[in-house]
Amino acid sequence: DENEWLDVEKLPMFDIEYLFIKIRAVSVGETVKLNLTCQEEQCNGTGEVTVNLDDIQCTKPTGVEPKIMITDELGVVLRYPDWNLMEGVQKIDSNQQPIEMLKACITEIFDSESVYDADDISKKELSEFVDNLTFPQIEKLGEYFDDMPKVFYDASYKCNTCGKEQSRTLEGLQSFF
């Protein structure tokens, strides 16, 4: 329905970052100047790069599906983290952030006989489920998040100290402001 409002807080983080960059480009200006550190080991210099915000792109997922089998019989369905989730995760201990994000992004757990909606599972049961995952299983689930779209820009610059031409891919909103 065209009269429905878009709930920004439910958009995936990468969509919000992309929208923010586009709004910033229109409201304040299309370019931002950044000083990037030299990548040479013995150099402490920097290089300036002017980023045209209209040139920032969003990576496309390479095909890691949200439905992931963690054993032959057991699987989960994941979703991308949204604004509310990322805001909440920032408030907890950094060591716990990845696990808490994983718990919050599980939408379903299923086996060969049943599908369990995460909203119908208690927090305690969900915590026990995630706590019992092996490291290889957690790594497999992590591939979904590693494949998540990201805003990025390929920057080229010259160090003002050693003069070396360099390039670096900037990722995530924090890279641009």
Q: Predicted segment positions?
A:
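Long C-terminal interaction/binding lobes of large macromolecular proteins
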Residues: D1-F177
